[in-house]
Amino acid sequence: MEEYSWENFLNDKLLATNQVSAAGLASEEDGVVYECVATPDENNPDFDKWSLFYKEDYDIEIEDENGSKTTKTITEGQSILTMFNEGYASDGIWLGGTKYQFINMDKGLEYEGHSFDVATCAKSKGGMHIIKVGGGHILIVLYDEEKEQDRGNSKNAALAFSKELIESTDTGAA
């Protein structure tokens, strides 16, 4: 029997719903994405799915209320972990070099007998949900309003996947 990969699991259970444009799994240990899938960009022959989910540490310039500028180093995985620990992200969440505005955190969100911590973030014409699934996994899904995907349906698809992931991990299936 052929081994069922994380990539196949993400493709078959999330991307195939057409409710998300991309999905990735990150480690609860460091917040770094270790597997991802994405709908190909027909307008970009050089499209790389990893560019949506990972960028090496980088610096951004931040302006405070007095107009003073400072430099901040962005470590994407760490920003995700900090958001879960603190329950918010005042500077937003950065993923693949893109800034997402932190909208809210639902700690202990109940879904079909399971409890998840779910963060919702937005950007122009889209956004993402980040779900602490348990079992060492963090699920990240991106949705694109230009592809007729929306915040609610993408969140439901992500929660259904999270439930299936935690149940399959509990039984050793994934």
UniProtKB/Swiss-Prot annotation:
This is Profilin. The record marks Y34 as: Interaction with Pro-rich sequence. The record marks Y88 as: Interaction with actin. A motif (Plasmodium-specific profilin mini-domain) lies at residues 47-53. One of its GO terms (cellular component) is actin cytoskeleton. Residues 99-111, 151-155 are annotated as: Actin-binding. The keyword Cytoplasm applies. Keywords: Actin-binding, Cytoplasm, Cytoskeleton, Lipid-binding. Gene3D superfamilies: Dynein light chain 2a, cytoplasmic. InterPro entries: PFN, PFN_sf, Profilin_apicomplexa. Essential for the invasive blood stages of the parasite. Binds to proline rich sequences in various regulatory formin-like proteins and also to membrane phospholipids. Binds to actin and affects the structure of the cytoskeleton. Weakly sequesters actin monomers. The actin binding residues are poorly conserved between Plasmodium and other organisms. The Plasmodium-specific profilin mini-domain may have a role in binding to membrane phospholipids. Residues 4-9 are annotated as: Pro-rich sequence-binding. One of its GO terms (molecular function) is phospholipid binding. Transmembrane segments: none annotated. Belongs to the profilin family. Binds actin. GO terms for biological process: actin cytoskeleton organization; cytoplasmic actin-based contraction involved in cell motility. The keyword Cytoplasm applies. It is found in: Cytoplasm, Cytoskeleton.
